[in-house]
Amino acid sequence: MSQPKLSHLAGTLVGSEIVKLGNAISERIRNGEKIYNFTIGDFDPQLFPIPAELEALIIQSYRDRNTSYPAAEGVLDLRVSVSRFIKEWEGLDYAPGEIQIASGGRPLIYTVFKAIVDKGDKVIYGVPSWNNNHYAHMTGGEHCVIECTADNDFMPTVEDVKKNIKGATLICICTPQNPTGTTLSKNTLSAICDLILEENNQRGAGDKKLYLMFDQMYWTLTYGSTVHYNPVAERPAMKEYTIFIDGISKVFAATGVRVGWALGPESIIAKMKALLSHIGAWAPMAEQKAVAKYLLQTDAIAAYLKFFKLEIEERLRSIHAGFIALKQKGYAVDSVSPQAAIYLTVKIDLSGKTTGAGNLLSTQADVTSYILSEAKLAVVPFSAFGAGAKNPWYRLSVGTCIKEEIPEMLGKLEAALAKLN
């Protein structure tokens, strides 16, 4: 069937590869197939419910009939609570007028791009990374892609940024990072900030400045000795050029509650508000009122995070240990030690091997298909995050992982690996 003539954007836009893969896996599970599904960056609410206090506040908020339109910038009491929350937990000073509320991170990221990036403007981002390629495409930006490697925890280096920074409009950094679960070091972040400040000092009064979109949606979920650093704490002058993306989606396992916030210069926040007022991507009034109260419950938040982080970290470390054990047995797999978020970065480098049935795994797509069919293991290749098609690394998300199934999953993976020649 021929497709109707639509806009250039509609004709060239690629849907989320992660959602597409996840939907295909979910369909197989619904049809009765046993699959260890580590594809979607979400949580099983039966394993990871939202905080009980937040749930009660949301229910009460609906009973209080908080169901009218919220203010376009977000209700004032929530913006005040966010201001207090980030001051208490991260040491950041942002007034309510420097805070924009929306229905999660996506509309905030989109409006950052729309507020800053013109057609042809250079957008710098590393790959693998989440959706920067799509947002750059939707705004007509010039893609300046940094291919990141395991040697640097799949994060951009100072040299990567330095050689591309001239003429750039936006740099996108996510730390802790989706999809890798790795973080940007203090020294690297500080040096990148220095490059941005130096570049902006060289631009004229009428020139567009270079901005940093800093996605820290996972910043509370760090493990072991890992520490999260942010640009404004490291270089206070960066406040003029930084837009933070944050929210409750991952920190409170509240992906479906849809409350996110951006922090940034009031002039940019005002334009994001104007864009969102036309898009209408507001967080629901009842949830905003509930989150405003919950963010002030310091003890409840600390207790929830203690449980939550222990459970996530246990899953990440258990699977990491399993992959390292397989590597030590001589199999072509590897894993990056868990640092943060809900993701484990694993390597499954089987291209060129032959299956027991005599089929050659000639591409990484063949490898992905093989481990799904033989080991019943579903993971997302880094190619879904903008990396090259031959990249042998994968994102493994543990938000729906049943701990007791991990040994069984690893056993099936080893059996599948053992069949290859």
Each language-model region and where it sits:
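Conserved glycine-rich beta-strand-loop-beta hairpin in the small C-terminal domain of fold type I
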Residues: 292, 306-320, 332-355
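N-terminal small-domain helix-loop-helix segment of the aminotransferase-like
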Residues: 2-7, 11-104, 111, 295-297, ...
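Conserved core of the PLP fold type I
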Residues: 60-207, 219-236, 362-363, 411, ...
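Hydrophobic residues in well-ordered beta-strands that form the structural core
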Residues: 125, 145, 173, 212-214, ...
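Conserved core segment of the aminotransferase class I/II
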Residues: 55-56, 81, 234-313, 317-328, ...
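PLP-dependent enzyme catalytic core of the Aspartate aminotransferase-like
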Residues: 84, 360-361, 370-379, 385-421
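Short, surface-exposed loop/helix-turn segments at secondary-structure junctions
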Residues: 276, 353-365
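Generic structural signal for small/hydrophobic residues in well-ordered secondary structure
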Residues: 21, 38, 58, 82, ...
